[in-house]
Curated annotation (Swiss-Prot):
<keyword id="KW-0968">Cytoplasmic vesicle</keyword>
<dbReference type="InterPro" id="IPR003409">
    <property type="entry name" value="MORN"/>
</dbReference>
<feature type="repeat" description="MORN 5">
    <location>
        <begin position="137"/>
        <end position="159"/>
    </location>
</feature>
<protein>
    <recommendedName>
        <fullName>MORN repeat-containing protein 3</fullName>
    </recommendedName>
</protein>
<feature type="repeat" description="MORN 6">
    <location>
        <begin position="160"/>
        <end position="182"/>
    </location>
</feature>
<dbReference type="Pfam" id="PF02493">
    <property type="entry name" value="MORN"/>
</dbReference>
<comment type="function">
    <text>Assembles a suppression complex (suppresome) by tethering SIRT1 and MDM2 to regulate composite modifications of p53/TP53. Confers both deacetylation-mediated functional inactivation, by SIRT1, and ubiquitination-dependent degradation, by MDM2, of p53/TP53, promoting a proliferative and cell survival behaviors. May play a role in the regulation of spermatogenesis.</text>
</comment>
<keyword id="KW-0677">Repeat</keyword>
<feature type="repeat" description="MORN 2">
    <location>
        <begin position="62"/>
        <end position="84"/>
    </location>
</feature>
<feature type="repeat" description="MORN 1">
    <location>
        <begin position="38"/>
        <end position="60"/>
    </location>
</feature>
<dbReference type="InterPro" id="IPR052472">
    <property type="entry name" value="MORN3"/>
</dbReference>
<feature type="repeat" description="MORN 3">
    <location>
        <begin position="91"/>
        <end position="113"/>
    </location>
</feature>
<feature type="repeat" description="MORN 7">
    <location>
        <begin position="184"/>
        <end position="205"/>
    </location>
</feature>
<dbReference type="GO" id="GO:0001669">
    <property type="term" value="C:acrosomal vesicle"/>
</dbReference>
<feature type="repeat" description="MORN 4">
    <location>
        <begin position="114"/>
        <end position="136"/>
    </location>
</feature>
Length: 238
């Protein structure tokens, strides 16, 4: 008796529609219910590859790399100027899991920006910050604050070189008062100089030198005096 194959069971029509709706590869613009728009590549129904996303309510745009539906890789985020309608660059650099991560530049205003390393959306690692008032900080960051070794150059060309903690001068450091020709070297605690020495430094070239030079003062055991003064501030092991 000949074998008769059973007829192939027809797939429900909803499965056919669902398969057609699945997004993979390059697609033209796809609109969300809230008005957002995405144009670019997809994988397994997620934004993946190169693409551009426009937020309608935020009036902002991201152009760059995507991975599994999140910004990941290199990309640029811009916001629309309410007066001109043009898009102004806010951040250009690397992303991971939808957050700034790696090396990138963030523009806080036309005259204030940061270029350097990021971690989980915060400035972390090495970076340089240009402030609107003309000050420049270059050095280490942690949790969006100066932490570690760094140099702050003020707009008047005075500068601090040394240790930082939580955005404040903390630990050993040097402050160059180039406008009056003096140098302070010592220990700082939460932005306040606690123990150190002040000497003349480049006084003849300073634009506003002090009226009289600092007299030279010496102690028999300067290292011992400094250590004794620092101990209450940092303890025995610092």
């Amino acid at each position: 008796m000949p074998l008769v194959k059973a007829p192939k069971k027809a797939e429900p029509i909803w499965k056919e529609w669902d398969a057609k709706a699945q997004k993979a590869g390059l697609r033209h613009s796809v609109y969300s219910v809230n008005g957002d728009e995405y144009t670019g590549e997809w994988l397994n129904n997620l934004r993946h590859g190169k693409g551009t996303y426009m937020w309608k309510r935020r009036k902002s745009i991201y152009e760059g790399d995507w991975k599994c539906g999140e910004r990941s890789g290199f990309g640029t985020y811009s916001v629309q100027d309410s007066n001109t309608g043009e898009y102004i660059k806010v951040y250009s650099g690397y992303w991971d899991n939808d957050k700034k991560h790696g090396y990138g530049t963030h523009f806080y205003s036309a005259k204030e920006y940061y270029e350097g390393e990021w971690k989980c959306g915060k400035r972390c690692g090495w970076g340089r910050m240009y402030f609107a008032n003309g000050d420049i900080y270059e050095g280490e960051w942690l949790e969006d604050k100066h932490s570690g070794q760094g140099m702050l150059c003020l707009a008047n060309e005075n500068r601090y070189e040394g240790s930082w903690k939580d955005g404040k001068k903390h630990g050993p450091g040097k402050f160059y008062y180039l406008n009056k020709g003096q140098l302070y070297e010592g220990v700082w605690v939460e932005d306040i100089p606690k123990c150190g020495t002040m000497v003349d430094f480049g006084r003849t070239e300073a634009p506003y030198p002090t009226k009289y030079p600092l007299p030279e003062v010496k102690v028999a055991d300067p290292e011992g005096v400094l250590k004794e003064a620092q101990q209450p501030l940092f303890g025995e092991h610092e």
